[in-house]
Amino acid sequence: MIHVKYIILGFIMVSSLNLYAANNDIIANKKVVKVEVSNEHLKTLNEASTLLISCVDFRLIDETDKLMKQLGLEDNFDKVSLPGASLALINDKYTYWGKTIEDTIEILQELHNIKQIVFLDHRECGAYKILIGQEQLNTKEKETAAHAAILNKARDIIKEKFPQLKVYTFLMGLDGVVEQIYEIPS
């Protein structure tokens, strides 16, 4: 009986998605899309030096790409996006997010020979508000301190599990200003 419920629920979910797509002309009518290849030379590459771990927030997609270019990493990084970026690695509610990050690092070391991790958190992050609480973020100083503590904890976890990798941590404002968060000496 349980199997039947799952099948029915799965059918309803798929039907709902199809109904949404049918009502969304921009997506529903696109059977095949040709996307212009901007970097033909990338087809032959099989390495990327860096894994960027950033938040899923749509507000900073372009700024994130610009940062990676300014860091000299354009066309030289893989990317994982999860709510909260570094918070995804250490939060107690969604522990599988941390496992996802660790598994991704493991496979990308083999696939793309990554040598470093860049964590990119951002200010006014909804995941931070939900998972650590608004009261810990209600001033710029508190917000910076909360991100710095979590970024440094994430750095420690990565260094312990993947000691051969360099880890860099950054905090981006919604205005595009990016601060590097340095390791707190023990």
Curated annotation (Swiss-Prot):
Residues 1-21 form the signal peptide. It comes from the Bacteria. Keywords: Signal. GO terms for molecular function: carbonate dehydratase activity; zinc ion binding. This is Uncharacterized protein RC0076. It comes from Rickettsia conorii (strain ATCC VR-613 / Malish 7). The lineage of its organism: Bacteria, Pseudomonadati, Pseudomonadota, Alphaproteobacteria, Rickettsiales.
